[in-house]
Amino acid sequence: MGTVSSRRLWWPLPLLLLLLLGPTGTRAQEEDDDDYEELVLALRSEEDGLVDALQHGATATFHRCAKDSWRLPGTYVVVLKEETHRSQPERTARRLQAQAARRGYLIKLLHVFHDLLPGFLVKMSRDLLELALRLPHVDYIEEDSSVFAQSIPWNLERITPARYRADEYQPPNGGSLVEVYLLDTSIQSGHREIEGRVMVTDFGSVPEEDGTRFHRQASKCDSHGTHLAGVVSGRDAGVAKGASLRSLRVLNCQGKGTVSSTLIGLEFIRKSQLVQPVGPLVVLLPLAGGYSRVLNAACQRLARAGVVLVAAAGNFRDDACLYSPASAPEVITVGATNAQDQPVTLGTLGTNFGRCVDLFAPGEDIIGASSDCSTCFVSRSGTSQAAAHVAGIAAMMLSAKPELTLAELRQRLIHFSAKDVINEAWFPEDQRVLTPNLVAALPPSTHGAGWQLFCRTVWSAHSGPTRMATAMARCAPDEELLSCSSFSRSGRRRGERIEAQGGRRVCLAHNAFGGEGVYAIARCCLLPQANCSVHTAPPAGAGMGTRAHCHQQGHILTGCSSHWEVEDLGTHKPPVLRPGGQHDQCMGHRGASTHASCCHAPGLECKVKEHGLPAPQEQVTVTCEEGWTLTGCSALPGTSHILGAYAVDDTCVVRSRDVSTTSSTSEETVATVAICCRSQHLAQASQELQ
C-alpha cells in the first residue's frame, strides 16, 4: 500500500493559473484485488473550479501485474475511452510529452494503437503517472509486464474419435481454408515439417534477452515457435496438415515477451484483416503473463471482429483466471493432459485449471519439429502444445463450416470432447467443481451434429463473504441464457435469479449472512430465433409453496430458479414430484420468489425429469437421454441443507451438506429437477443441408 502526499493550494486563483504547469499533488491508493493491483489517482483541491479548468472531472485508474518480478516499470500502455476520436491517441500523447517536457522529463512514444483499441505505448518515468492519469480522455493506464512461452505421437490418436482410429491419423480435412496466426518466437521456416506452409511476417516486437552473456543461437531462438507450428500443421506430426500459418515474433530467444508487444502483434493482425479480408482466422497465443486488463480487452475486440483466439491456460498449477490472455472470456483457453488423460505435471508446477479453462488437450511429450536441423524432431510439454492442438481442430471445423461464429465453435469443441476422463483429485478441492472435465477431440464428422442443441455451463467468479455480496455469470453475446442456478460450499446463500443488465440477461447469485460466498452458474445455449422471458411468482407465505408458470402462448419452460430475502428458509415439507401434465411450472419454497425461464423458438420441445432421495445425500443427479440437452438444473425445496445445483454436461447435480455434519429429519428429501430440451427445427435444417 503506497501513498503520494497531497498539498492544499492557498494562493489566489490568478497565481494558481500561472502555476498550472508546475507539479500538482494527488493522493494515490493501491488495492490488491487478487487478479491485479489498481492505483486510483484523483485530483484534490480546495478550489472547485480548478478541476473543471483542467478538465480532470473523470478519474482514471492504474493497473499492474500482481506478480512483482513480472512487472516492467517505465513502460506503460495508456488506454483512452472508447468514444474518443481516431485522432485522439496522437493528440493525447503529444500533450503528455509537452507537459512532461515543461517539468524536465522526456517521454518516448513507442506505438500508437488505432485498430485494436484507442491508446498508445510510452516509455516514461513513473513520476509522470499522476500527470498522465489526469489527462482528458484517459480511461486507464497499465504498466507493461512480461509474458512467457508455455512449454516446458499419442496426441494425434487421442483427439481422433474412437470409431475412426486406425494405424494412421486421418483427419476429416486439412484445415486448408483457414489461416492460423502464431504469436511466438521466430520460426525455422525451412524445416521439412512446415516448409511452404508458414509465412514469416516482417512483424517483430520483442524485448532484449536477460543477461549480458546470453548467446543467441538460431536453434534456440526458433525452438518454441518451430515446434508449435509443426503441431498445428506439420506434414507428419501436425493436427491440421493443410492449414497455413503466419508467424509473428513477440517472444525473444528466451521465450519471453511483454504485454505491449503482444498488443502490437494483435493490432497487426487486425490491420491485416481490415486491409485484406480473408476467410476464417485463428490466432494461437501460446503464452501467459499476469492478469492484464488491457490484453483481455484487446482479445475481446479481436474476437468481436470475427477472429477465433486460442490461448494456453498456463503452466503454473494455478487458477487460470489469474493470468492473461487465459482469463479473457472471449478466448478459448486450453489446459494440458497426458497420454492417460490426466493433468500434466511439470516438476513442481503443471497445467493451470479452474473456471476460465474451456477444455484440455494433449500437452505432454508432444512430438514436433525441432529447430536443431531441418529434419529433426523433439518432444515438448506444456499448455502451449495443448493450445496448438485445439487451434488445429478449430481450423478443421472452420474449413468444414466457415460461417461458424466463435460461440458456435466453442460449443462444438465442448460438445465433442471426451468427457469425465480426467482424475479430478489432481486439482485443488475448491477448483474441482469449477474445472471442466473435458479433453478435446475431433467430431466424428465436421459436417454433422447440425441438429444438436448445444449448451455449456458458465461459472462466475466467487463472490465476497459479505451478507449482500452477489456473483454474476453471463453468456457470450451469441448465446441464450436458458437457466440460472447457484452454489455455496457453506450452504449459506439466498438463491439466484435472472436479471437484465445493459440489454443482456445475466445470472445473479446472492450470498447470505455468515456465508463464505457464492457462485452463479449460467446455462448458455445456442438457440436461433429464440424469444425468452422470465415469469416470477412472489413468496406465498403459506401453503405448499410458490409456483411460477410460462404464461405466454408457445413459450416453453427451460429453467427454474428462486431467491429469498430471509437468511434461512428452514425445513420444507417433502417435495411432491409432479405428474406428467404439470411440467410447465417451477415450484419453490413458500418463503421464496420463484422464477420460470420461458422461451419460444422454432421446433423447441422440452421435458422435466425429477429424482428425489431421502436426506441426507451428498448429491443427487439426473441425466438427460441421448439426443436431449440439459437446459435447466435446480433443486426442489425438500431440505434446508442444499448447497446448490449445477450442470455438468447433460447431468444436473444437486449437492447437500456433508452427511457427517447433517442433522436431518426423516421427512427431508433431496430432489433434483432437470429440464431437457431438443430442437426439431435444427434437426430439419440439418437434414436439408445434407
From Swiss-Prot:
GO terms for molecular function: apolipoprotein binding; low-density lipoprotein particle binding; serine-type endopeptidase activity; very-low-density lipoprotein particle binding. InterPro entries: PCSK9_C1, PCSK9_C2, PCSK9_C3, PCSK9_ProteinaseK-like, Peptidase_S8/S53_dom, Peptidase_S8/S53_dom_sf, Peptidase_S8_subtilisin-like, Peptidase_S8_subtilisin-rel. The modification Phosphoserine is found at S45, S686. It holds the Pfam family Peptidase_S8. One of its GO terms (biological process) is regulation of neuron apoptotic process. Residues 153-459 form the Peptidase S8 domain. Cleavage by furin and PCSK5 generates a truncated inactive protein that is unable to induce LDLR degradation. Undergoes autocatalytic cleavage in the endoplasmic reticulum to release the propeptide from the N-terminus and the cleavage of the propeptide is strictly required for its maturation and activation. The cleaved propeptide however remains associated with the catalytic domain through non-covalent interactions, preventing potential substrates from accessing its active site. As a result, it is secreted from cells as a propeptide-containing, enzymatically inactive protein. Its main location: cytoplasm. Residues 448-690 are annotated as: C-terminal domain. Residues 29-150 form a propeptide. Its EC number is 3.4.21.-. Its cofactor is Ca(2+). Its proteolytic activity is autoinhibited by the non-covalent binding of the propeptide to the catalytic domain. Inhibited by EGTA. Keywords: Apoptosis, Autocatalytic cleavage, Calcium, Cholesterol metabolism, Cytoplasm, Disulfide bond, Endoplasmic reticulum, Endosome, Glycoprotein, Golgi apparatus, Hydrolase, Lipid metabolism, Lysosome, Phosphoprotein, Protease, Secreted, Serine protease, Signal, Steroid metabolism, Sterol metabolism, Sulfation, Zymogen. Glycans are attached at N531. The active site is at D184, H224, S384. The record marks Q150, S151, R216, Q217 as: Cleavage. It is found in: Cytoplasm; Secreted; Endosome; Lysosome. PROSITE patterns: SUBTILASE (PS51892). Residues 75-147 form the Inhibitor I9 domain. Belongs to the peptidase S8 family. Crucial player in the regulation of plasma cholesterol homeostasis. Binds to low-density lipid receptor family members: low density lipoprotein receptor (LDLR), very low density lipoprotein receptor (VLDLR), apolipoprotein E receptor (LRP1/APOER) and apolipoprotein receptor 2 (LRP8/APOER2), and promotes their degradation in intracellular acidic compartments. Acts via a non-proteolytic mechanism to enhance the degradation of the hepatic LDLR through a clathrin LDLRAP1/ARH-mediated pathway. Monomer. Can self-associate to form dimers and higher multimers which may have increased LDLR degrading activity. The precursor protein but not the mature protein may form multimers. Interacts with APOB, VLDLR, LRP8/APOER2 and BACE1. The full-length immature form (pro-PCSK9) interacts with SCNN1A, SCNN1B and SCNN1G. The pro-PCSK9 form (via C-terminal domain) interacts with LDLR. Interacts (via the C-terminal domain) with ANXA2 (via repeat Annexin 1); the interaction inhibits the degradation of LDLR. PANTHER family: PEPTIDASE S8, PROPROTEIN CONVERTASE SUBTILISIN_KEXIN TYPE 9. This is Proprotein convertase subtilisin/kexin type 9. It comes from Callithrix jacchus.
